[in-house]
Every structure is written in structure tokens, then in C-alpha cells.
Amino acid sequence: MGNSVSWGECAEFNPKSELPDIFEYVDLESVVGTDILSHRTESKSSAPSRAQRLAQKGDVFYQTVRPYQKNNCIFENDENNWVFSTGYAQLRPVNDGYFLLTLLQNEDFVKLVLDRCTGTSYPAINSNDLADIDVNIPINNLEQQRIGDYFRNLDSLITLHQRKYDKLTKVKKAMLKKCFPKMVLISLK
């Protein structure tokens, strides 16, 4: 595929930053798949101690606890007041974040991570061990970007079709209720 490099060469890990007084907090339950589904407003003075990773647009967040769940995301928001839990490794990509996210979601990569995890009930990897894992990446930055864009577009299509499916399922359920309002199931004895 290209060059074998460590993750530490692909991204800056856990960049230092000063937290804002009020921020939107993303904990480990907030990300499902590659989507941020929820967040909550916190103040710096009363926030959980794990609220430490100030997000910047384009940052990739990798769930270091139970990484087999593949709840990792790219932060696409322009706002500068979002903070993630230290349960995520924060990767600030050297090149294309979507390409890195695609690699992180790859089952072979997950196996490499699990081999380096500690703990059995809640396997976890620390950011330094994650940064030391070697990956093969294209030398050409444009190729990385095209690969990342390709998989981002596929993910968008999947999401769109999932929403259509969910909507049609609700329509079907409503129509069945309307067409058969008093249908009673009769059990034979």
C-alpha cells in the first residue's frame, strides 16, 4: 500500500490545551459507531475529571476502552468549546482525518489494538501504545484524501438509506394500524 509508519507519525496525540469555562462534553456513551449522538453542557469547575480533550475541527477521537466497539469519530464542528473524555485518544491528523478514521475502523487494526490491550472485562490501550502501532499508508497525501473521501461518502449513503428505512418502517406501522384498527388475534385452544 505504501509506507509503514507508526500512528504517532500520522497524528499528534492528545494535544495540550486550556479548557473553556463552559463547554459541550462528550463522554464514552455519546459516540456510537462514527456518530456523536449526544453531549451535555458542563462548567469547568464541576465537570468530570475525565473531561480533558478540547476538540478542534478535523480531530479524530479513538475510544481506548473496549476498542472492539469501534465507537470512534471525527470532529466536524467549527465550534471551539467541545471537550471529550480522556476515554478517547485525541488524534490531530498530519494529513487526512477521514483516511485515519477509516484505518481505525478496520477490523485488522482493531485486532492489532486488542493484542496490546490490558484488562479482560474492559480491555483498554493507552495512547502511547496506540501511537506505537505501525500501519501501512499511501505515500501520496492526495491518495490518502481520496480514500478518506470515498469511505466518508459511503458512510453518508449508508446513513441516508438507514434514515429512509427507519421512516418507511414507521409509515408501514402506522398504515397497518390504520387499515386494521381492531384486529384481534384469536388463539386456538
At which residue positions do the language-model features occur?
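Feature detects amphipathic, helix-rich regulatory segments
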Residues: M1-K189
